[in-house]
Amino acid sequence: EKMEEKRFIFISYIELAKYLKDKEETVMKNTIDDMINQCKDFGFTDIILQVRSFSDAIYYSDIFPSSITIVSKEGDKLPFDVLDYFIKMSHKNNIRLHAWINPYRIRSNLSKAEIKDNNPAFKYLNTNKVEKNAKGIFYNPADEEIRKLILSGVDEILDNYDIDGIHYDDYFYPSDTIDLENYNEAKKDNQDLTLQQFRLENTTKLIKETYERVKKKNKNILFGISPEGNITNNYEVNYIDTKKFASEEGYVDYLMPQIYFGFFNSVKPFYQTVKEWNSYITTDKVKLIPALAFYKVGCEDLYAKDGQYEWVESNNIIAREVLTSRPLSNYQGFAIFRYDSILSDNLTDQAFKEKENLKNILKE
């Protein structure tokens, strides 16, 4: 029996701000209808929609303020429940809808938006539960109260929406300094505890508890993460124990590594990297769904060394990435990052060709 290939597309806060922010309700709804139709026409089966990008919400929440990606000012009244509308229209079109949450980010370094008392981060601003650094403002992953806050946000979605999945992206550990106080405290109980162990344990707790909440609600709802494609960075920068999640049941239903590399990338050539990820999965409870970098089409890839011009010179990289991934033992589908790169109506000729080449192999 042939397994259905899942075809995911990310709709990020960047698309939401571009297409929906500050528009009239009817315009917003028509735009959402159009986006979902585009996804359906292309053949996407699953949408990963960013519902919380900055300690906020694109839905009616009692915990988080409305998102600046939809309204002019954080906390302004949402014209309607954007998540609810996306779910209804997706289901009407036989597309599954996953709520994508950025668990730790409160602000990016580009954001000048003030944090007011309607944001749960407000009361933690001068504590070690929150850190302001060069990348932005972030919740501390080592803090128990913060973990409870993130989980209560997940529960709120599970309780109020007919969601098909919960998804976390790759922004795990925000910095090298955010949790040092907590670490020193933890070392009093265990002298041998390394900082790396401590950090991996903190994110693992969040992942495990999220999985448990999701499955308690409904075992058919999926939970997965999209860690960075470079495994080393997951252990040394993001502190996320991807090998554990790949080999043991009870953490994730799927891993969606961001394998944002071409075939000639000197550091992480695509095929070798996707095979490496596949080899870590040793339980049939976990599936592999590589995320692919459609946003790189037509661009120079500065860190790819030998593959620097690959995305400029070729127009069928994404299609070939899908074709080479399909035979892998744990493969269940692919994901495209992101909507605007593949479905906007002003694609470059090259992106259009890349898109057509991908579409052609979906008919098979």
Locate each region found by the language model.
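Polysaccharide-binding and catalytic clefts of secreted carbohydrate-active enzymes
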Residues: 28, 84, 119-248, 260-261
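Active-site-adjacent "subsite" loops/lids of carbohydrate-active enzymes
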Residues: 4-29, 98-99, 104-160, 305-309
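Substrate-binding cleft of secreted/luminal carbohydrate-active enzymes
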Residues: 249-267, 276-364
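Catalytic domains of carbohydrate-active enzymes, especially glycoside hydrolases
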Residues: 30-57, 160-165, 248-254, 325-334
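Alpha-helical scaffolding within the catalytic cores
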Residues: 208, 231-244, 267-281, 317-322
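Aromatic-lined substrate-binding rim segments of carbohydrate-active enzymes
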Residues: 35-36, 49-102, 188-217, 269
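Glycine-rich, aromatic-flanked loop segments that form ligand/cofactor-binding clefts
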Residues: 44-52, 79-131, 167-169
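The substrate-binding groove and active-site-proximal loops of carbohydrate-active enzymes
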Residues: 14-26, 64-80, 133-151, 192-202, ...
